[in-house]
């Protein structure tokens, strides 16, 4: 999927 931020790791 799209690249995830380390803080929103869902």
UniProtKB/Swiss-Prot annotation:
This is Bacteriocin IB45. Bacteriocin with a broad antibacterial spectrum against various Gram positive, Gram negative food borne and multidrug resistant pathogens, and against some fungal pathogenic strains. Displays bacteriocidal activity against L.monocytogenes ATCC 7644 (MIC=80 ug/ml), and inhibits the growth of M.luteus KIBGE-IB20 (MIC=160 ug/ml), P.aeruginosa ATCC 27,853 (MIC=80 ug/ml), S.aureus KIBGE-IB23 (MIC=160 ug/ml), B.cereus ATCC 11,778 (MIC=80 ug/ml), E.coli ATCC 8739 (MIC=80 ug/ml), E.faecalis ATCC 29,212 (MIC=40 ug/ml), A.terreus KIBGE-IB-35 (MIC=40 ug/ml) and A.flavus KIBGE-IB34 (MIC=20 ug/ml). It comes from the Bacteria. It comes from Lactiplantibacillus plantarum. GO terms for biological process: defense response to fungus; defense response to Gram-negative bacterium; defense response to Gram-positive bacterium; killing of cells of another organism. Keywords: Antibiotic, Antimicrobial, Fungicide. Optimum temperature is 35 degrees Celsius. Highly thermostable. Retains 60% of its antibacterial activity after heating to 100 degrees Celsius for 3 hrs. Stable during storage at -10 degrees Celsius and loses no activity during storage for 6 months. Optimum pH is 6.5. Retains 70% of its antibacterial activity at pH 8.0 and pH 5.5.
């Amino acid at each position: 999927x799209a690249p995830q931020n380390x803080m929103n790791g869902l």
